[in-house]
Regions:
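N-terminal active-site segment of His-dependent metallophosphoesterases
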Residues: 1-40, 185
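Beta-strand-turn-beta hairpins that frame and shape the catalytic cleft
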Residues: 1-8, 151-160, 183
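Residue-level recognition of beta-strand->loop/alpha-helix junctions
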Residues: 12-14, 44, 122, 218
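Cys-nucleophile CN-hydrolase/nitrilase-fold catalytic domain and related Cys-dependent amidase chemistry
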Residues: 19, 27-114, 120-122, 191-206
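Active-site catalytic loop in hydrolytic enzyme cores
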Residues: 67, 80, 99-179, 192-201, ...
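CN hydrolase (nitrilase-like) catalytic-core segments centered on the catalytic cysteine
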Residues: 67-90, 158, 164-253
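Short beta-strand scaffold segments in enzyme catalytic cores
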Residues: 91-93, 106-110, 150-152, 233-235, ...
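A short C-terminal boundary segment appended to hydrolase-like catalytic domains
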Residues: 260-279
Length: 279
C-alpha cells in the first residue's frame, strides 16, 4: 500500500568552486532538514561543485549501487549522509563518469538510508543557450546526455528524477507520470535571467499537466565566473499551487506531502486518462 504522506525538504545552496566547503554545507543543511522531519532531502544541481567545467571533469565518479573502493568523495558523502540521518537523499546533478572522459554525465542519484544508490538518472536535455546575461552556456561541450527516464522509490512512494533544464520538456514529466510517479524532483541551477520569468511558471505547469507534486531544489546567489542563480526552492502541489518556498539565501524548505491529493486531483480532472492519439 502506498503511504499517504511523505515529508520532503528542498535544500537551497550557493555552491562555489570548493568541493570541501560545498559538501560541508550539504551535510549541515541536510542534517538540519532530517532533524526537522524530512524523509526525503533533495539537493540542487551542482551541489558539490560550481567551478570550471575542466575541474568538474576531474571530479567525475562511477555511480554504483553498493559502496565501493571506487567511490569518489561526492558519493561517499551522500552515502554517509543517508546512513547518518536515516533519510533518502537525492543528489541532483553530480558528475558521473561516461565512456567519453571529456564529457561525464550530469547525474541525479537517489541514495537510500542504508547507503545504497537505488536509482540514478542521467540528465537528458543539455543547456545549450544564450539568454542575454553575459554568459554562454554550452553544456553539451562538457557533458554527455542521458537517454532514459527514471522513477525511483522512496518509502513506497514513486518519485521521478529530473535535472534543471529538463523542466522545459513536458513530455518527460508525462513519461514519469505514466511510469507511476506521484512526486517529481527538480534539482536546478536556474540562471537569474531565466528564473525570474520562467521558474515558477514552468514548475506549476509541470505539476498541473502531470498532476503530481513537484519538489524543486535550487542554487542561489553568486558563483565563480560571474554566474548568478535564481534560488526560490519550492514545493508545488498537483493543482499547481506553491505550498512552500525557501527564503533568499542558503537554507531549506520543508513540507509534508499529502499524497491523497494526487488521487483527488487525478479523479476530479482526469486529464491523464483523457489523452487521445493526435495525427
Amino acid at each position: 500500500m502506498t503511504p499517504q504522506e511523505l515529508t520532503v525538504a528542498a535544500v537551497q545552496l550557493e555552491s562555489q568552486a570548493s568541493l570541501d566547503d560545498n559538501l560541508e554545507a550539504v551535510t549541515r543543511l541536510s542534517r538540519r532538514a532530517a532533524t526537522s522531519g524530512a524523509e526525503l532531502v533533495v539537493l540542487p544541481e551542482n551541489f558539490a561543485y560550481m567551478g570550471s567545467e575542466e575541474d568538474k571533469r576531474e571530479l567525475a565518479e562511477p555511480v554504483l549501487v553498493e559502496a565501493s573502493p571506487s567511490d569518489g568523495p561526492i558519493l561517499c558523502a551522500l552515502r554517509a549522509l543517508a546512513r547518518d540521518t536515516g533519510a533518502f537523499i537525492i543528489g541532483g546533478g553530480m558528475p558521473e563518469r561516461s565512456a567519453d572522459p571529456e564529457r561525464p554525465f550530469n547525474t541525479s542519484v537517489l541514495v537510500a538510508p542504508d547507503g545504497r544508490v537505488t536509482a540514478s538518472y542521467r540528465k537528458i536535455h543539455l543547456f545549450d543557450v544564450s539568454v542575454g546575461d553575459g554568459q554562454l552556456y554550452r553544456e553539451s561541450a562538457s557533458t554527455s546526455a542521458g537517454e532514459r527516464s527514471v522513477v525511483g522509490d522512496v518509502r513506497g512512494v514513486p518519485v521521478g528524477l529530473t535535472v534543471c533544464y529538463d523542466l522545459r520538456f513536458p513530455e518527460l514529466f508525462r513519461k514519469l507520470a505514466d511510469g507511476g510517479a506521484r512526486v517529481a524532483t527538480v534539482p536546478a541551477a536556474f540562471t537569474l535571467m531565466t528564473g525570474k520569468d520562467h521558474w515558477h511558471v514552468l514548475l506549476r505547469a509541470r505539476a498541473i499537466e502531470s498532476q503530481m507534486f513537484v519538489v524543486a531544489a535550487a542554487q542561489c546567489g553568486r558563483h565563480p565566473r560571474g554566474r548568478m542563480t535564481y534560488g526560490k526552492s519550492c514545493v508545488i502541489d498537483p493543482w499547481g499551487d506553491v505550498i512552500a518556498q525557501a527564503s533568499d539565501g542558503p537554507g531549506f524548505v520543508l513540507r509534508a506531502l499529502d499524497l491523497g491529493r494526487v488521487d483527488a486531483v487525478r479523479e476530479s480532472l482526469p486529464c491523464l486518462t483523457h489523452r487521445r492519439p493526435i495525427g
